Amino acid sequence: MDRIPLPPMERPLIAILRGLKPEEAEGVVGALIETGFTAIEIPLNSPDPFRSIETAVKMAPAGCLIGAGTVLTTAQVERLADVGGRLMVSPNVEPAVIRLAATKGMVTMPGVFTPTEALAAAAAGASGLKFFPASVLGPSGITAIRAVLPGDLEIAAVGGVSEVNFADYAAIGIRSFGLGSSLYKPGMSAGDVRQRAIATLAAYDAVYGGQQ
């Protein structure tokens, strides 16, 4: 199956809003978009996640990538398509889930930790790979695994990543990240999220500004 590529993004950062409630979605998502985030993931173990995703899809401008994380089944992929999601992130490698999401036109980012998982995800047509948890693998672990992967496959570091270690990953050529608790924790106000987003993007630009 042909791989659906990640769309061009000035900053390839995915905001992970685990625990977001539907009534908070408009304010929090709006704050992220206003500050410059263009990819947003709402994990399916959040309260009533598809309502939040639908809200985000409806309010996001063209070019924003909105979707779900913790996608485990093909039924969840179908539901995600129904609400207009275009991003499918999973914690594991399930070829049937990846392939169905691709047929729905979604960008797919399965989670991997080993060379076997990474190659299986690539064979299933994943748009990119989510190396998780990046805090355990570290830059050296990701470098070792990346050596055996297709060169055109996008790699994102997720889990334990924040503005304090962007430079560590920049040193090995990684510029895509999924940002969770360093950016958003359940119950945070839209104003607090906006301030965290501003600080995060400033730190990213300080490291990667010359590479964009």
Curated annotation (Swiss-Prot):
Listed pathway(s): Carbohydrate acid metabolism; D-galactonate degradation; D-glyceraldehyde 3-phosphate and pyruvate from D-galactonate: step 3/3
Site (Plays a major role in determining the stereoselectivity): V158
Enzyme Commission no: 4.1.2.21
Superkingdom of the organism of origin: Bacteria
Knockout or disruption consequences: Cells lacking this gene fail to grow on galactose as sole carbon source.
Enzyme class: lyase
Subunit structure as annotated in this protein's UniProt entry: Homotrimer.
Protein name: Probable 2-dehydro-3-deoxy-6-phosphogalactonate aldolase
Taxonomic lineage: Bacteria, Pseudomonadati, Pseudomonadota, Alphaproteobacteria, Hyphomicrobiales
